[in-house]
Amino acid sequence: MNGIFGTEYTKGLQNGQDDRYVQAVVTLKHWDAYSLEDSGGFTRHNFDAIISNFTFADTYFPAFKETVQQGNALGVMCSYNSVNGVPTCANSFLNSVLRKEWGFQGYITSDTGAVADIYKEHK
């Protein structure tokens, strides 16, 4: 359902009356497995989500994949947290999955301070 909603939302915002131009650029966020602000001494800046490959494929990737491939989303924002010990903004999934497997052609941006978190917060 999230993939369908994301696809239609993206098409509605990006597609204007003239097919030669993008009306707006939709940025999908937050890549990936971002769901914590502050809990038990962890914050979004230092949290490491431990996720299996199955959970990625079953839970986290489908909505992003559908919106990239069917909705032609032109932006993706990586999140503050790490996934399986790798900060999301430095994760090879940005190239191996997003660009190579799914054919994403748009831009990738970080959330505010997420790149600095790579060396300041993630150990």
Annotate each PLM feature.
Residues 1-123:
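Glycoside hydrolase catalytic-domain context in secreted enzymes
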